[in-house]
Amino acid sequence: MLKRTQQRVLILPLAFAGLTFLLHLISNLFFRYGYFRDEFYYLVCGDHLAFGYVDQPPLIAVIARVTRTLLGDSIVAIRLPSALAGAGLVFLTGLMARELGGRRFAQALACLSAVVAPVYLIGGNILSTIPFDQFWWTLCAFFVLRLVLTDDPRYWLAIGATVGIGLETKHNMAFLACGIVAGLLLTSNRRYLRSRWLWIGAAIAVVIALPNILWEIVNGWPTLEFVRNASGGKNAHVSPVAFLANQILSLHPLTLPVWLTGLVVCFRTPRYRLLGCLYLVPMLIFMATQSARPDYLAPAYPVLFAVGAVAIARAAERPHRMWVSSAAFVPLALTGLLLMPIGLPILSPAKMEALTARLTGAGVNDPSREQGKTAQLPQYFADQFGWPELTAEVARVYAALPPADQAKAV
């Protein structure tokens, strides 16, 4: 049982996590558009379980299969695990702020930053690998933070397990692993290279990820071919400057002071430099590819929200600085409400189309679009329309085929 003091300090992270879950639940119950295109694919993958697929590891298919078996295949049902993952990310963000010594305001600011970020709202509202990838990155960052704060090398076991599960969710986790390795080599944490716990943790990660690795080897590394083809023919070209601009937009512009403060504090504080590497190294890799979507780096921000929120809260505690807390929290909360339709389908299609037109006219384009194409709605919303009509058309054509052709139709 948690002690009463422990229960009190968990109230805010739990409250914000609950709010996040309710936002997703309500939007899918009352304001949803339709199934997102990739959701059909993941459901089909769930019907054909394997140790890997061309474009993702196996865990999302398992999640789809279990969810469909237990809850059915309604939009609300299949998106429930994603909503839980999004809520878990918010909870861990507040928990990290608490671990850093942050009081109520610091925890609230860290959580609010995660709640209002459109990239997390979008991810938590669709069945895909994205919200689970974001959750595993955040959980791994939490364990790294605990390692840094306690100097207990046994946390490498939890880090290794989380990396392994993350690699079975989305190969994006490999970039976080690169950040951990760089942080070990470039900071005083290289002393852990002599710890058996580090190597046991690394072995745990490899063992968990091994089924998918073997599948890739046996099938000739199809995911690498998929990534190459996507970079050259599917994903839009993104310059380093545009990539950073997309980060600011997808995380909500007013969270910039929070996570940027967190990044500065990480590298100015020797103890936290390993945490800074969890962000900086993946960022440099994604910028170098010039084809990475904003959501690729999004999982690296919760720990920066936590560090930055604690630093801002401490600045607000100084004499004549009480205004800092209001200046940081109130505008973020208000604009978070105003920008919520960007992340959740709470407007009618016509109103969302009008909002998209206004944003495009102001020079704010959908950063998730492929090959720079623009549309009347953001791509993650536009691809939730037209499926009933397509189904009806396919059924009509199929019914018109001779019986012999129907038997051969796929």
Residue ranges and their predicted role:
Residues 2, 13-14, 93-116, 134-135, ...:
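Transmembrane-helix signature of polytopic, membrane-embedded enzymes
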Residues 17-20, 110-115, 163, 167, ...:
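Short helix- or helix-capping micro-motifs
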Residues 31, 174-271, 287-290, 341-345:
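Transmembrane-lumen/periplasm boundary regions of multi-pass, lipid-linked membrane glycan transferases
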Residues 80-101, 139, 143:
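Transmembrane-helix motifs of polytopic, lipid-linked glycan transferases
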Residues 92, 132-150, 155-163, 307:
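Specific aromatic-rich, kink-prone transmembrane helix
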Residues 98-101, 140-156, 261-270:
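Membrane-interface transmembrane helices that cradle and orient dolichyl/undecaprenyl
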Residues 119, 125-133:
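Short acidic/glycine- and proline-prone juxtamembrane loop motifs at membrane-interface regions
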Residues 315-358:
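Signature aromatic-anchored transmembrane alpha helix within multi-pass, membrane-resident enzymes
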